[in-house]
Regions:
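Short acidic/polar active-site loop segments enriched in Thr and Asp
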Residues: 106, 142, 162
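Short amphipathic alpha-helix that is part of the acyltransferase structural core
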Residues: 4, 11-12, 16-69
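Conserved acetyl-CoA pyrophosphate-binding loop and the N-cap/start of the following alpha-helix
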Residues: 119, 123-128
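Conserved catalytic-core motifs of GNAT/GCN5-like acyltransferases
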Residues: 24-27, 147, 157, 162-176
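A conserved beta-strand-loop-helix scaffold within acyl/acetyltransferase catalytic domains
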Residues: 66-115
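Conserved GNAT acetyl-CoA-binding A-motif
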Residues: 129, 134-149
Length: 176
């Protein structure tokens, strides 16, 4: 999926030729634009992620560093891995990311949603989540959950996510 960054307005874009889009980002990519920055962005599940670039993105959002080989294993065991790139003909830049785990048939959980702070507040996270939900629906998954930090819960509520009452159905275990 491709989109152009044009202020608070996100609109589908056809700025990149179909061949170039498939060549750079793979099949089923989504191109869009965001009007304020006049930049083109692409969501894709098929473009390979550079693990160093992903680590740098996660550092910019303030997450603790994870060993690269463990990140690779987590990606390998995910049912969906999505990158959000600022388009450039030669060097697309990873500015967003999310992954999903699950049984691949009935249920999935969205993890590690991240958008570079420079690009937050422009509607890119919303487009990333729309793309993820569309792709999960395409493989037949009808129940999706996610865990979010308190400071971003309102973002998900605005996207139509329903919050579960505290403690009613969730239990957590953390290794020491």
């Amino acid at each position: 999926m491709i989109f152009r960054n044009q202020g608070s307005l996100i609109k589908k874009s056809n700025s990149i030729s179909s061949d170039e889009l498939i060549n750079l980002y793979g099949l089923n990519s989504y191109e869009f634009t965001q009007t304020s920055k006049e930049e083109i962005f692409v969501c894709s599940k098929n473009k390979d992620l550079d693990l160093i670039e992903l680590d740098q993105l996660l550092q910019t959002v303030g997450w603790s560093r994870r060993p690269i080989r463990r990140v690779k294993r987590a990606l390998d065991f995910s049912i969906l891995v999505v990158g959000l790139w600022r388009h450039d003909d030669k060097f697309p830049r990873l500015v967003g990311f999310a992954r999903c785990t699950g049984d691949g048939i009935l249920e999935a959980t969205v993890w590690d949603v991240a958008v570079n702070p420079v690009y937050q507040g422009l509607g890119l996270g919303k487009e990333l989540m729309k793309y993820i939900l569309k792709e999960l629906k395409n493989i037949g998954i009808s129940k999706v959950t996610l865990f979010a930090d308190a400071e971003v819960v309102s973002f998900y509520k605005r996207q139509g996510w329903i919050l579960e009452p505290r403690g009613s159905k969730c239990a957590f275990w953390y290794a020491n």
